[in-house]
A protein has these predicted regions:
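Catalytic cores of eukaryotic secretory-pathway lumenal/extracellular enzymes that build
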Residues: 130, 170-176, 194-195, 199-204
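SAM-dependent methyltransferase
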Residues: 218-289
Length: 331
């Protein structure tokens, strides 16, 4: 464990396994962070605590392909800021000088908002999407790491934020416990999760077409998946667009079409933007290695089991589960 004298002033990384403080060193011209026993490479100014190739590779490709698509600064919209505000459920001005951990940052759609409001931000992602985020936010402290083996001190962050990630981890409940470990007592945990209901876990006609397409897509070699998904998307998107004003036809289409189509749920600017956002999220939903669903009750029960307080969870406008909890001072 880290000695008490380091607890408040140390701002760097620790070994994910031993919690020893890591020091930067140069070996044969290459930079590393190292402890007594372990060392981790720094590549393109980003510390890497995982193998560069892992189950999140498709996400890494996705966020490099769509590096700016969902950035408010690029779209001219406030979609990401509004979602962040809704999940955190606090004034974003309260983020100023707060030590915030963003778990699963992708290309940085929320990173730029957190930085804008003055958060002392640390971000990480399992995939090499961290490189896209670093390009979008050059001053960001960021690393490539696993949510189950994070290189951070325990009881350190004021706020831990995890949006769009837990459902893609091997064990969402264990991931929540790990997030709580690095959160200060009385700190704020803000998370979301895919919602468990019949439509999300059964095949058509009760469920959606994603149930049928995804297992087939995952059988395809990773390097070919995007091309296949784009062909599927390009077939279905014109049909969705033609009937974009009919909610009834859109409901029918979801039983046979696997694509995401946001005309009735997001106020995007034009057809190209609907196309780009739809293709991005269609790729996301068809290539995720893990896909879990939980009810509000399941999430709340697990947080109660971990002695969290002020637990506030609900079904969000996009039909997911999201909310906040306060870490117990006595955990």
């Amino acid at each position: 464990m880290i000695k008490n004298k380091y607890k408040k002033k140390f701002l760097g990384y620790v070994c994910p396994f031993t919690k020893e403080i890591l020091k930067k060193t140069c070996i044969n011209g290459n930079l590393f962070l190292r402890s007594y026993k372990n060392k981790y490479p720094i590549i393109n100014e980003i510390p890497r605590f995982v193998e560069l190739k892992n189950y999140a590779n498709d996400f890494g490709f996705q966020w490099k392909k769509f590096r700016k698509t969902q950035l408010d600064s690029f779209s001219g919209l406030t979609v990401s800021e509004e979602r962040l505000q809704r999940v955190l459920n606090i004034p974003l001005t309260d983020l100023k000088k707060k030590k915030v951990l963003e778990a699963g940052c992708g290309s940085g759609r929320f990173s730029e908002i957190l930085l804008k409001y003055g958060a002392v931000l640390t971000s990480f992602d399992l995939s090499d999407a961290v490189e896209s985020n670093k390009l979008n936010n050059p001053s960001l402290k960021i690393c490539q790491a696993n949510i189950l083996e994070m290189p951070f001190q325990n009881d350190y962050f004021d706020i831990v934020l995890c949006i769009g990630v837990l459902q893609h981890t091997p064990n969402p409940e264990k991931s929540i416990e790990k997030l709580l470990e690095v959160l200060k007592p009385k700190g704020l945990l803000a998370i979301d999760h895919y919602r468990r209901k019949w439509r999300n876990i059964l095949p058509p006609p009760i469920g959606t077409a994603t149930f049928l397409y995804r297992p087939i897509i995952l059988l395809i070699k990773s390097k070919y998946r995007f091309k296949v998904i784009k062909k599927i998307f390009d077939f279905w998107f014109p049909i969705h667009w033609k009937f974009r004003k009919s909610k009834f036809i859109q409901r029918l289409l979801r039983r046979i079409s696997p694509i995401h189509f946001y005309f009735n749920s997001l106020n995007l600017k034009n057809k190209k933007m609907f196309y780009d956002w739809g293709l991005l999220d269609t790729h996301d939903s068809l290539t995720d290695f893990y896909k879990h669903h939980r009810t509000v009750k399941q999430i709340v029960s697990h947080l109660q089991y971990n002695k969290c307080q002020q637990i506030k969870f609900y079904i969000n406008p996009m039909d997911g589960v999201e909310g906040t909890a306060i870490k117990s001072q006595n955990k």
